[in-house]
UniProtKB/Swiss-Prot annotation:
Belongs to the metallo-dependent hydrolases superfamily. Peptidase M19 family. GO terms for cellular component: apical part of cell; apical plasma membrane; extracellular space; microvillus membrane; plasma membrane; side of membrane. It catalyses: an L-aminoacyl-L-amino acid + H2O = 2 an L-alpha-amino acid; leukotriene D4 + H2O = leukotriene E4 + glycine; L-cystine-bis-glycine + 2 H2O = L-cystine + 2 glycine; a beta-lactam + H2O = a substituted beta-amino acid. InterPro entries: Dipep_AS, Metal_Hydrolase, Pept_M19. Inhibited by L-penicillamine. Beta-lactamase activity is inhibited by cilastatin. Disulfide bonds join C87-C170, C242-C274. It is found in: Apical cell membrane; Cell projection, Microvillus membrane. This is Dipeptidase 1. Residues 385-410 form a propeptide. It is a lipid-anchor; GPI-anchor. Glycans are attached at N57. It comes from Oryctolagus cuniculus. GO terms for biological process: antibiotic metabolic process; cellular response to calcium ion; cellular response to nitric oxide; glutathione catabolic process; homocysteine metabolic process; inflammatory response; leukotriene D4 catabolic process; leukotriene metabolic process.
Length: 410
């Protein structure tokens, strides 16, 4: 399919493992598109986003899960880089910090043009494959990054965001996060508020993939039922295999199957084995389970490299993808199923999201109400009326009547 991949440095496979040999042959033709990598966050923490610092050189960077030699060795041909800002930025400087992390991805492409090609659509991914480069896309991790603004959502799209995780480890004013299911946060939106539904519709209109990693089960179901395009879980695993609330339960996996959506398995030990230690084989157990419940077309990889502190034995960094593919082949996965998990399932969903988008359609314009927002550092104009006034149309008129009576004008 993408024949120029033979130009990449060949991986020496000094082993009698025929499954690993086969895995390498598959990866040379169909490289992996990983759904979630937090290298930009590491570049912020270690170098304050100074990419020209000699220590930040991605050809030699040693203390991260990701660098250019590791990407090459792992046959990573596409990567959704995470533009992540922590929840403590919500109602503060989250938009600024999100823009800075998106800028890091663009500068990576500028500094290493022989390796990275920043793209924004499915055709761009295939172009990068043909050129033997890593297709570099941006996923914004956390709905708080749009600061409850449809205008910010649209602006981030124009700057390259192609998926938005509806929450991180905190509620937004319009969507509930997974900690609600654990009892650590209170449900505020019942999944998605009215404004949250507007966000989903606008993402469909724009062609932004809806990412349900980190959200509550109620939010998962609400978004899956509302979205007119398939959705993704960019870095989540199977709840039945490991009963962690960040993972996807069986009834949601059924909705994933019905909607043609994707679950990109996370490699974080705590989500893989529900313990501090895990193995590559246990990651394959999650992939097997999702394939059996939701179908092979639903399976993907979302390693969460450089975003987690513990990774399975055998999957220590991005170079280890050939070993994971070999394990799937060893378990009887067909070559077509493997190619789907590597890239083709994602390309299918991306194309469907692009087909559903209709930017000629009138954009969502109704802003959120000021009463629904947290924080005190906000101006008072440009918001909707409180939802209670929308539910009771006579409330505003009654309030005005009381005011006029008090002034003796009625």
């Amino acid at each position: 399919m993408w024949t120029s991949w033979w130009l990449w440095p060949l991986v020496a496979v000094c082993t009698a493992d025929s499954f690993l040999d086969q895995a390498v042959q598959i990866l040379r033709v169909t490289p992996v598109i990983d759904g979630h990598n937090d290298l930009p966050w590491q570049l912020l923490n270690k170098f304050n986003n100074r990419l020209q610092d000699s220590r930040a050189n991605l050809t030699v960077l040693a203390d991260t899960h990701t660098n250019i030699p590791k990407l090459r060795a792992g046959f990573v041909g596409g990567q959704f880089w995470s533009a992540y800002t922590p929840c403590d930025t919500q109602n503060k400087d989250t938009v600024r910090r999100t823009l800075e992390q998106m800028d890091v991805v663009h500068r990576m492409c500028q500094l290493y043009p022989e390796t990275f090609l920043c793209v924004t659509d499915s055709a761009g991914i295939q172009q990068a494959f043909r050129e033997g480069k890593v297709a570099s896309l941006i996923g914004v991790e956390g709905g708080h990054s749009i600061d409850s603004s449809l205008g910010v959502l649209r602006a981030l799209y124009r700057l390259g965001m192609r998926y938005l995780t509806l929450t991180h480890n905190c509620n937004t004013p319009w969507a509930d996060n997974w900690l609600v299911d654990r009892g650590d946060d209170e449900a505020q939106s019942g999944g998605l508020s009215v404004f949250g539904q507007r966000v989903v519709r606008e993402m469909n209109r724009l062609g932004v993939m809806i990412d349900l990693a980190h959200v509550s089960v109620a939010t998962m179901k609400a978004a899956l039922q509302l979205s007119t395009a398939p959705v993704i879980f960019s870095h989540s695993s199977a709840f039945t295999v490991c009963a962690h609330k960040r993972n996807v339960p069986d009834d949601v996996l059924q909705l994933v199957k019905e909607t043609g959506s994707l679950v990109m398995v996370n490699f974080y030990n705590d989500y893989v084995s529900c313990a501090s230690e895990a193995t590559l084989s246990q990651v394959a157990d999650h992939l097997d389970y999702i394939k059996n419940v939701a179908g092979a077309a639903a399976v993907r990889f979302g390693g969460d490299f450089d975003g987690v502190t513990r990774l399975p034995v055998g999957l220590e960094d991005v170079s280890k993808y050939p070993d994971l593919v070999a394990e799937l082949l060893r378990r009887g996965w067909t070559e077509a199923e493997v190619r789907g998990a590597l890239a083709e399932n994602l390309l299918r969903v991306f194309r469907e999201v692009e087909q559903v988008s209709n930017q000629a359609q009138v954009p969502e314009e109704e802003p959120i109400s000021l009463e629904q927002l947290g924080g005190s550092c906000r101006t008072q104009y440009g918001y909707s009326e409180a939802p209670s006034l929308h539910r009771r149309p006579g409330a505003l008129l009654a309030s005005l009547s009381l005011l006029l009576l008090s002034l003796g004008l009625l």
